[in-house]
Regions:
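C-terminal effector-binding regulatory domain of bacterial HTH transcription factors
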Residues: 1-11, 216-248
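Short linear motifs at protein or domain termini
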Residues: 1-110, 120, 241
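Non-transmembrane, amphipathic alpha-helical segments
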Residues: 99-102, 126, 191
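Conserved amphipathic alpha-helical segments that form helical-bundle/coiled-coil interaction surfaces
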Residues: 107-188, 198-205, 217-231
Length: 248
């Protein structure tokens, strides 16, 4: 008789179709692939996109509305729109992150393993077009009219482009998953000229390593960038008293 202890099975989890749709739309919002005041496709169009009923789509949209991510508007200019992040939303996000801080630490650790190796592979495989994209993201991020939201969107695009350039779809998927987890925390970071300048500097370092097709330097620079980002999130979210307690 086989010993059940030898198996690593997971219990069946029946995910509703509406939950599946909600997760995909929420991921796109978190990753800034849709920005505030962008209008979602109509319920009918979403039903066609997801091959689902309009009732199911409506359930998914109601869940997103309850989270404060979208708003349904009526009238001549009605529709469903992405809502901007408010101060209250920031407060809720911080509370949610701190309630499950151990999970965030696991994500930081996972990111440290995945993204530097993605940069290593990208240095060998990146195309001229992808390098041009990365450069354009850096240029846009330091423009005077670059909003906080667009700055965050450009940061996501920069990292996802490198992941795609790795040529490994599993790695690209992993980086999307990582960004979905850490983006709410990054949205809490300050936005000013110093932040923009620091971001430009480290992204330029990564870009130069990729342009040189230097795998080791690309990996090391990305690893340094990720460590700095994790430290910044920690310093922003964890109070000095909590930090002292964690160090004892």
């Amino acid at each position: 008789m086989l010993n059940q202890q030898t198996f690593q099975f997971e219990k069946v989890s029946a995910i509703k179709v509406s939950e599946f749709i909600r997760e995909q739309l929420e991921e796109a919002i978190i990753l800034k692939e849709m920005l505030s005041e962008d209008q979602l496709p109509s319920e009918r169009e979403l039903a066609e996109i997801f091959n689902a009923s309009r009732i199911t789509v409506r359930e998914a949209l109601s869940a997103l509305e309850a989270k404060g991510l979208i708003e349904k508007r009526v009238g001549a200019k009605g529709g469903t729109f992405i809502l901007p992040i408010t101060a209250n939303a920031h407060k809720r996000t911080k509370e949610e992150i701190m309630r499950d801080w151990d999970q965030m630490l696991h994500v930081f650790e996972y990111r440290t393993i995945v993204e530097p190796e993605g940069a290593f592979l990208a240095a060998e495989r990146i195309t001229a077009g992808e390098l041009e994209l990365l450069e354009s993201y850096i240029v846009q991020s330091v423009q005077p009219d670059c909003s906080r939201e667009w700055f965050r969107a450009l940061d996501v695009k920069f990292h996802l482009t490198i992941a795609k350039a790795s040529g490994n779809p599993y790695l690209e998927s992993a980086v999307r998953q990582i960004r979905t987890k850490i983006n709410p925390a990054l949205d809490l970071m300050p936005y000013n000229e110093q932040v923009r300048s620091l971001n430009q500097g480290v992204h330029t370092e990564i870009l130069e390593a990729l342009k040189a097709h230097d795998p080791a330097r690309s990996r090391d620079t990305m690893k340094k960038h990720i460590a700095f980002s994790a430290d910044a999130i920690y310093s922003r979210l964890v109070s000095p008293e909590q930090q002292e307690g964690n160090e004892q």
